[in-house]
Amino acid sequence: MANKINKSSISSSQHLLTKRSTIFWIINSCLIFFFLFMPFQSGLLNGSQPNYEIDILYSFIIGAILLLCLGIYMYRSRRASLVHNPFRYVIWSIPLIYCISMIGAVSAHYSYIEFMIWIFYAILFMTAYHLLRQSDGQQIAFYIYMGSASVIVLFGMMNWFGNASLWGLFPWEVYPDAAMPSSGDVRLTSVFQYANTYAAYLIAFLFACLFTIVVSKNKYVVLFASFMLVPALISFILTLSRGGWTTFPVILLFVLPLLTFSKQIQALFQLILALIASVIMLPSMNSYGLQLQQDHTQGTALLAWIILLGGSLVTAVIAFAFQKYVATRLEQKLQSFNKRKLVMFLIPMLGIVAGIAGAFLLLGNTGFTKLLPASIGDRIENINFNQHSVLERGTFYEDALSIWKDYPIDGAGGGAWQALYQQYQNNPYSSTQVHSFFIQMLVEVGALGMLALFLTLAIVYYYFFKSYLKKTDDEKLMPSIWYIISTAILIHSVLDFNMSYVYLGALVFFSLGAMLSSSEAKTFLWQDKVLSNKLTIVIPAIFIVGAAVYLIMTLVNISGYHSFNTVQKSIQEQNVQQSIEQLDNAISRNGDPEYIDYKLELLTRTYESTLEEQYAIEVQEILDKMSKQEPYYENFIFRQLELNRLLGNDEESAIVSKIAINKYPWEIDYYVEFAKTQFRRAVTAIGEDDLQLANEYLQSIFEIRDVVTAKALELELLPDAQLQGREFGITAKLAMPIGQAFFVLGDYVQAASYLALSWDPAFDDNDDVMAALYYSAVLQKLNQSNEEINNTIFAAFPDTQEDLSAILDGLIGTLPINN
């Protein structure tokens, strides 16, 4: 007979995650360190570069410690922990699918890193779930979030006022763009160095402050939240984020229904109060900020801070007085009205009407925006669907869906968009992010991954709302904060890559775990049997062993990074063999393709200087191996072309260039390389008197020209507001081999028209001299003056004038191959 649950033993076990517990303080210390310190590592952007990756790896150490603490807690209180919501484990389905997607991933390394990141998210989710079931945990987590968000906001304003170093105490060398120049404006970006993501973060913080003001009973907390509301709102405006401005009212509609009708009135009063104060202060904040970034003076900076902090303090006092003296009476008068069904949706509905009116006021020809600083007013007036950021996002999404169609079930693995987008892109833009979290995830883990994500979100939000409606007002504050954070960032992430910042991703999944922790699940049918079974040790054991494995994997990767860093710093002080051995050590521990590319560069340079065949052989062996592990890492194509050039293997170069053109149809450099290779092959064939073969090579150059011309015409069909992206068409570099081909064939008029494009008197490219000589020769053949060109060439290279003159005479004397 199954043993019944011993509720007293379950209750007594809860002390393991309260203030009396060592585990409790270890977990909170890790959370304080992560949420307060790690955002200053560029927000932990997953930027697919070693200098970004190392900070993410250090965060995984925190994750391993948290997972170990969870394992110990769940082992020592396994009977208590098992009566919790069993659906909390659904979060692990997402990293599981990322693991599955690694099997056929287009990038071995970046799919591995993404898998590790999602394990970290799952750990934060589980940590929040267990920690915030205790009131002590709820309170400390709330203070950690509000404190860290306030630091980020104030740090942003420090940068806006021209100096965040605290009088030289912190150099902040990684934050040159915390206030970022953009298209003639300056946009506030704080630690994220990306205005749109900072706007999403600020939306969450703004609404968290609003809820705290109207719900919290702690007067000091209310004062603090009221004080931070104005700096956060001013910062939000200074991001100049049109996406943030347009999603703000949408998120407000998702947030307000959590409050009773009377508290919605209070929240709107506080928001309008802060908005009025912000608009009053905005002209001086804007002008002082722009001035201080150009010329920082202590007196002006002090004045700017006095205005900001003074205005915030006055607003906080008014907000506090309203809550103390007006809100209480408002609650009493509307007490019966609050209980009516659906009344909480009344103000959101009115908000939609107000939003339409506000949009007309701001976007219509009303002159209202003239009251705002010019940079902000112009930005608002330019909000429409026919602007480059909107059109480009539409292109990204369309191209991403094309990728997904080829990898529909489990996706192409982590980092797939960055690896594949150039093969599918509609025009030659450069973007390593899809600018939509959900679509990027669809590309990475396909339908299975999206199913796991939406299942997780559905479970969290279902249980959250189910329990939220039963809570008293005093019990609603903490759950509401985590709902606001996750909802605000996820909604904004539909249109941007906020979740590529691991810090924000961790915050979102911590918030989701916290939301689930506020709910209660019914006892499941087989609970008694599970609690009485020895299998209760399985999950704690998996967590403890998993923590050890996760930590080891992380430390190995960190060790590889530092080995690579050591090689880079000491490359001039040691011989090639020592550097290669250290690189091999780094690569064996961390297979970042950038490490491998650095080794290829070192081997190639060594072969070029020594001509020792062993180095060329090793380069080719590595490239053959990488063609399977990292087939879309573009630098490896350049390394292969470079090796072929050094080996004089033009036939292989032509093959590689053609393959590259198929993979990267909008990368003009591969067309150039193919054309240059085919011209060299034509010259070789002429020297061997195989004129038919030479003609075939030359004709292939014209075919490539026609392909490029046709594709360039496609770009003319883009909407006027959409940017083309990278240069594409008959560029100066491509014009040279085309002109040379016409020159060899004796069509000097055509040759001159193309070689004129490649003529560059700056001579800042290796091919510029030969292009100039060909252009001079073709002008001579057309009986046109080439004296100015010759004088320019010989003046630029006086030491080799005789050699250059001999080459020029040889070209002038060359007869067309068709004669």
Question: Which sequence ranges carry the predicted segments?
Answer:
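Transmembrane signal-anchor hairpin modules in multi-pass inner-membrane enzymes, especially those
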Residues: 1-100, 109-113, 133-139, 143-146, ...
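Loop-to-helix entry and N-terminal half of a specific, functionally important transmembrane alpha helix
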Residues: 30-35, 149, 225-232, 274-277, ...
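Membrane helix-loop boundary segments at the extracytoplasmic
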Residues: 36, 40-49, 235, 442-445, ...
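Hydrophobic alpha-helical transmembrane segments
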Residues: 99-102, 140-178, 233-240, 277-286
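Aromatic-anchored transmembrane helix interface
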Residues: 108-130, 143-144, 172-175, 200
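TM-adjacent membrane-interface loops and short helices in multi-pass inner/ER membrane proteins
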Residues: 164, 194, 382-432, 438, ...
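Membrane-interface segments at transmembrane-helix junctions in multi-pass inner-membrane proteins
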Residues: 168-206, 291-309, 437-441
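Hydrophobic transmembrane alpha-helices and their immediate junctions
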Residues: 214-216, 220-224, 447-480, 648
